[in-house]
Amino acid sequence: MGIIAGIIKVIKSLIEQFTGK
């Protein structure tokens, strides 16, 4: 669960960077 949650967090961060750009 921890690994999956970490991956989701990273993906969300990348999406925010692209959309926030």
From Swiss-Prot:
Biological process terms in GO annotation: killing of cells of another organism
Domain of life from the UniProt record: Bacteria
Pfam families for this protein: PSMalpha
Modified positions (N-formylmethionine) in chain numbering: M1
InterPro entries: PSM_alpha
Induction: Up-regulated by agr.
Keyword Nucleotide-binding annotated: no
Keyword set, alphabetical order: Cytolysis, Formylation, Virulence
More about this protein: Peptide production is higher in most prevalent community-associated MRSA strains than in hospital-associated MRSA strains.
Family the UniProt entry places it in: Belongs to the phenol-soluble modulin alpha peptides family.
Role noted for this protein: Peptide which can recruit, activate and subsequently lyse human neutrophils, thus eliminating the main cellular defense against infection. Stimulates the secretion of the chemotactic factor interleukin-8 (IL-8). The ensuing activation process triggers an inflammatory response in the host, thus contributing greatly to virulence. Also possesses hemolytic activity, which may contribute to the development of disease.
Protein name: Phenol-soluble modulin alpha 1 peptide
Native organism: Staphylococcus aureus (strain MW2)
Classification lineage: Bacteria, Bacillati, Bacillota, Bacilli, Bacillales
